[in-house]
């Protein structure tokens, strides 16, 4: 993308700080579901009737799908509209959260973690980074990414 095109995009978004705040908030919330095991491992294990091996298998599936999918995610984020990709990913992650609240069995849990990897790591994360990159020009991109991580950290503390 040329510097002129990027400058037009930056100038065309007078509400870019509002967009930035919404993206930061969504970036802090989007990965909470996949990291629920950090705080609720034992209750999750008891209520869902899962063994350590089964939870480890689901987390391994998440990692494998994430690793392979990130390569595809680089290309996917350029093919479709960012607002539809981010919105669709967040809605999909919410639907997976609702499904997990029904305490599915192992195969449902495994599928949910695979879908979360696709929605969170393949279709959401690269698009979020590209959207943040497009909000700033060459001089402010580093600052925008710093503010993104700061905002995600604040959201993590609050939630």
Mark where each language-model region is.
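Hydrophobic core of transmembrane alpha-helices in multi-pass small-molecule transporters
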Residues: 107-123
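Residue-level signature of mid-helix packing/kink "hotspots" within the transmembrane helices
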Residues: 35, 63-71, 157
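C-terminal ends and interior cores of transmembrane alpha-helices
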Residues: 91-105
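Intracellular juxtamembrane helix-capping segments at the cytosolic ends
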Residues: 122-137
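Extracytoplasmic
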Residues: 18-44, 48-52, 159
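Helix-to-loop junctions at the C-terminal end of transmembrane segments
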Residues: 69-81
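Glycine-rich segments within core transmembrane alpha-helices of 12-TM secondary carriers
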Residues: 142-159
């Amino acid at each position: 993308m040329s510097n002129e095109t990027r400058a037009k995009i930056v100038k065309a978004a007078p509400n870019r700080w509002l967009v930035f705040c919404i993206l930061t908030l969504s970036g802090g919330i989007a990965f909470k579901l996949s990291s629920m095991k950090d705080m609720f491992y034992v209750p999750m294990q008891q209520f869902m009737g899962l063994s350590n091996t089964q939870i480890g298998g689901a987390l391994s599936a998440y990692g494998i799908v994430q690793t392979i999918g990130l390569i595809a995610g680089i290309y996917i984020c350029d093919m479709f509209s960012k607002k539809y990709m981010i919105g669709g990913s967040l809605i999909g992650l919410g639907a997976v959260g609702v499904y997990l609240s029904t305490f599915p069995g192992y195969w449902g849990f495994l599928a949910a973690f695979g879908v979360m990897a696709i929605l969170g790591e393949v279709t959401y994360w690269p698009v979020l980074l590209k959207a943040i990159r497009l909000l700033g020009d060459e001089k402010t991109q580093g600052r925008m990414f710093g503010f993104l991580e700061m905002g995600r950290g604040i959201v993590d503390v609050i939630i």
